């Protein structure tokens, strides 16, 4: 729940970068937020008090290497992945972003419309949650039925 609740502040800070990149690099625009979800899950597990106290945690993650290398920073430094895992996670995120992009385009929304904007935000939110879920699973967390 903590990582999900952070979506509003993460999403608001991500939006200018995501929108700027969408026309030229739509899979980057969609995929990078999945990496951010993964980072947030990792930070929740390791240092949530510091991460939660950072009102602009997305900007903090982005600014270390810049937007274009946010993925590499998260995979290398935040998650500490080796080259093999780095490649596997990058391929997974790329596949997810491409599938979401295909679904988004299939909707036939008018580019620049309010409806298209809302759909884009919904896609980002779901990819953020997917990143969070992937990382929690990688760390060994799993759902257990209670009762």
Regions picked out by a protein language model, each given a short descriptive name:
Residues 1-147:
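Intrinsic-disorder/low-complexity detector
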């Amino acid at each position: 729940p903590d990582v999900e609740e952070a979506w509003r502040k993460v999403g608001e800070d991500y939006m200018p970068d995501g929108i700027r990149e969408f026309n030229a690099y739509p899979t980057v625009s969609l995929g990078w937020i999945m990496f951010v979800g993964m980072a947030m899950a990792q930070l929740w597990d390791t240092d949530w008090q510091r991460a939660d106290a950072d009102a602009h945690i997305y900007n903090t993650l982005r600014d270390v290497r810049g937007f274009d290398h946010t993925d590499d920073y998260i995979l290398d430094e935040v998650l500490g992945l080796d080259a093999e895992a780095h490649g596997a996670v990058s391929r997974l995120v790329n596949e997810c972003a491409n599938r979401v992009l295909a679904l988004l385009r299939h909707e036939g929304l008018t580019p620049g419309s309010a409806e298209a904007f809302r759909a884009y935000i919904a896609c980002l939110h779901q990819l953020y949650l997917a990143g969070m879920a992937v990382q929690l699973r990688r760390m060994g967390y799993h759902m257990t039925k209670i009762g």
